[in-house]
Each structure stands twice: as C-alpha cells, then as structure tokens.
Amino acid sequence: MKKNLLLIFASLLVMSCSSGDDDIMDNVDDNDDNNINLFSNKAKVVGYFPYYRFSLNNQIEYCKVTHLNIAFANPVADGTIVLPSTDNTTLADVVNRARSQNSNIKIYISLAGGALSSTTADIWKNFLANSQERPKLIDKIVQFTKENNLDGVDVDL
C-alpha cells in the first residue's frame, strides 16, 4: 500500500511540473540556427559566476545567458556588502563585458550562499534577528546594487 501511495504521489508530482501552456518549443523560430529564442518570456538561462572565477571573464559567452548571478557577497559588521576579490578582474569588469556582449542580460548579486564562515553567519543572524538593524542592511544592499549597475538581488540564505 505504501509503495502504491508513493508511486501515485511521485506521478502527481511529475505531472504537476509540466503545464501545456509553458512549452519551450513555442519559442522555436524555424529560420534561426539556434532554434530557441532565449530572450522570450518563457526561456531563461541563469548562470552563476563566483567571484573566485572572475579571471575567466574573457572566456564567458554572455550572449548565451539571460540572467547572471554574481556569487557570493556578504555584509560586514556595519552592513556594507562586500564581494571578495582574488585577482585583477573587478565586478565592474564583469558587468561591463556582460552588458557589452548582451544588452538584454539581467545581472544580480547573490548574497550569502556557499559556505559561510561563523563570523559571516553571525553577522547575517544579527541583522536578520534585529528589527532595528535590518533596515541598515537593506539600505546597504540597495546601495551596492545601484553602485554596481546591477538589476537585482538573489538571496541564498
């Protein structure tokens, strides 16, 4: 009986993941060599680009993604958002190159995610648990997003 219930549940889950209205093949252009219009309202290609791989910036084909998430930034004690750097390639270099190759690309900063140090985890906890500190963090996130010409934020807590 349990196996039958599990099978029924799994079948329903799989069927619910597919709706006839969102068929990606609706975006096929028979005259296009790539066949699928990546910039339709239906198809999304999201790439995560970790800061420690910024040295590969010149090898990335940004024209093949619709959304780029820069991973991972975190706040320091005063709420300032910091993206670590490991080489000479900056966030501005990545954003500028991505936008020069793909004017439709949406670029987001991914916050938290990955393996947080205990210090960074404590900073997040402090801001999230304290209703008076939370607005400071939000202001710093908005400031970082605007200063770096980003389109939004991906929170990966």
Question: Which residues does each PLM region occupy?
Answer:
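Glycan-recognition patch characteristic of GH18 chitinases/ENGases
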Residues: 27-145
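Short, conserved catalytic or interaction motifs in soluble domains
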Residues: 19
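Positively charged n-region of N-terminal signal peptides that target proteins for export
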Residues: 1-4
